[in-house]
């Protein structure tokens, strides 16, 4: 374990004293450091009447138990403090470590000992080996009582709300859209978990089309075949118009108003970051949206109709929209329990809706936590004029996702009434996505949130993984960079895949979010500042660093070679079938120079930290009137790399007081032969830009530019890079087995590494 502490807020000695005393620690400004430390440690043993016995079972140094030390005249030293602090944090001498000084240094222990009460204050805010901070662990053991009121420590809310006595209620919010065109504004189901208190509370809202269930069997039937010819597109220019994001004024007329919801629930799937804050006085709201189980309308998949339907829930929390107690629309109900301040949460589609909601500029949305979210749907299903499936899902497209999330059809009565109209709508959508050409068009433009980034007012927190080939890093990169310069924004850029990071051992992400939520939603003047970019170092285990930005302008140019080289697109049928059946076998061969590709190896002559988009400038020609080029950059070398999927450690994370416990996780640091740094794909007809389609003349040289997926990746002098240039990518692109070649003039081609 390593300590990476970004959530601690430095305080004055007076504040440290006051906060320690308020929690029951009997420290004194006049007492010695040793006396205060003894009082602090004895308080730790909440379940012991005889704390002398507990102290005898801990050690102050390899020869002295802790009780004997406290009874002696010896002063408290940094070495004794460090060894006892390790035991307080759950580390076991002679098992987890033998040399405490070296162990503390190796773990980057964040506390510099000076004997002050600030040391004890920061120790409470430090994570234990189990993943909980020491103060959270003690509160879970009833250090302070459940009060159903806010208690803050170091600018963060503690778990003082009763999660056994929550309000669990359902309302149906009236949206400004009628997506199924039945003449009625669509209602969306809202599932609410909130503390049982008599004062207004803020809310964490998760907009998830998956929340009420999915229709996987129907979606699987629509999965597209990836085999086929790359189409020759007519040359031309694509024209677009800016989408309108306007909703009619809401009708706020009450109808037989009531103050209590009539529908309850026993269980719903939850997100543990929401659970963590629920125990700390922030309501949890889950909304599936239009076209889902027990809501109304059709699934419009990423357009602003879907977004405005989610926005209506925030409007309802602020008195700007109506909600009904049931879909019969007989009684309206207000959110009289809500303060109106909201943060959105969730990963993938959920993070996507966080991005989209932020661009509406809706009042009340104070903070957005967008984890691995899409910022432009074209960049999820397409790339540079090509069909490019999300990693791991070849053949998926927006129509299959629409079918997957249209859970309204899981209700047989709804199926009976609406399926015919829905299928007609789905056919229109399947045409509009234009799998034939792979081009950007008005349909995709209507689902591009980046163009409205200037409307964002909320504080934005992004998380994204360098190894996320599902929602690729371009999505966070372009949104992060498009936000107004004056806006407060933050990015946690890790080395994982398409994964949550709130349960990781190496970083205090959830505590950082606690501090930020208290500041933005509860109005707590805690002085908390979060760095702009927090990056997980790819070269070592559990190491995080602060950076100033994502994307730098400096570039290191690498000439690709001195000759020409060709890529054969065609494979023998047996190999083509094998790769199509198991794309991982294609990737294995590709990276080991066993597939149809140009493989170029380079040894770095300097240290470099890639930050941004690796750019390829290639002089190419195709033997036919079409073609595509794919590229991947890898670090080669048999050594340890961070694996992309977090491994569970132990079931030790407590999100309250024995509430929604979950497994602690971390990216394993494992031996491997290589690591993918970045990748990209381009239709040669889109070599100028996304909106320009040009002819490809057989055997005529062209200069193309290809920006690969953005990343942050550290390399040392002597490290080996491998650039692989190829055509068909069996994981991502159309699988065209035509017999043509793409030739690259390496002497006129280069790779630029941004730093």
UniProtKB/Swiss-Prot annotation:
Subunit structure and binding partners: Homodimer.
Protein name as it appears in the record: Xaa-Pro dipeptidyl-peptidase
The encoding gene: pepX
Reactions catalysed: Hydrolyzes Xaa-Pro-|- bonds to release unblocked, N-terminal dipeptides from substrates including Ala-Pro-|-p-nitroanilide and (sequentially) Tyr-Pro-|-Phe-Pro-|-Gly-Pro-|-Ile
InterPro entries given in the database record: AB_hydrolase_fold, Galactose-bd-like_sf, Pept_S15_Xpro, PepX_N_dom, PepX_N_dom_sf, Xaa-Pro-like_dom, Xaa-Pro_dipept_C
Reported function: Removes N-terminal dipeptides sequentially from polypeptides having unsubstituted N-termini provided that the penultimate residue is proline.
Disulphide bridges, residue numbers: none
Organismal lineage: Bacteria, Bacillati, Bacillota, Bacilli, Lactobacillales
Enzyme class: hydrolase
Subcellular location: Cytoplasm
Active-site positions on this chain: 348 (charge relay system), 468 (charge relay system), 498 (charge relay system)
Known EC number: 3.4.14.11
Family label: Belongs to the peptidase S15 family.
GO terms, molecular function: aminopeptidase activity; dipeptidyl-peptidase activity; serine-type peptidase activity
Predominant place of localization: cytoplasm
